[in-house]
Amino acid sequence: AYLPPLSTEALLKQVDYLIRSKWVPCLEFSKVGFIFREHNASPGYYDGRYWTMWKLPMFGCTDATQVINEVEEVKKEYPDAYVRIIGFDNMRQVQCVSFIAFKPPGCEESGKA
């Protein structure tokens, strides 16, 4: 990553923007924080593109601290996983924003955990 990790205050601002934009916050986690190929040799197929969703999308969420509290829960349950926050536009059915909220201790910037 080219940017330093976001502070809790910066995460709150990003999530506030996401909520003000009427996007639905979602959390995802993965033990591998980069795109990789494992199960298919065909061009353009990447196993690491999809992460595991934490619970359900947070429909109706109006408070950024609710999202940050969920990030803390993911960190406790999966301390060696990357956590990202997604903003999903449920009207257009597209992902509008995605950013890393947590990197596990000891991860390398080179793309390997």
From Swiss-Prot:
InterPro entries: RuBisCO_ssu, RuBisCO_ssu_dom, RuBisCO_ssu_sf. It comes from the Eukaryota. The keyword Plastid applies. It is found in: Plastid, Chloroplast. The keyword Chloroplast applies. One of its GO terms (biological process) is reductive pentose-phosphate cycle. One of its GO terms (cellular component) is chloroplast. Keywords: Calvin cycle, Carbon dioxide fixation, Chloroplast, Photorespiration, Photosynthesis, Plastid. RuBisCO catalyzes two reactions: the carboxylation of D-ribulose 1,5-bisphosphate, the primary event in carbon dioxide fixation, as well as the oxidative fragmentation of the pentose substrate. Both reactions occur simultaneously and in competition at the same active site. Although the small subunit is not catalytic it is essential for maximal activity. The basic functional RuBisCO is composed of a large chain homodimer in a 'head-to-tail' conformation. In form I RuBisCO this homodimer is arranged in a barrel-like tetramer with the small subunits forming a tetrameric 'cap' on each end of the 'barrel'. Heterohexadecamer of 8 large and 8 small subunits. Belongs to the RuBisCO small chain family. This is Ribulose bisphosphate carboxylase small subunit, chloroplastic 3. The lineage of its organism: Eukaryota, Viridiplantae, Streptophyta, Embryophyta, Tracheophyta. The gene is RBCS3.
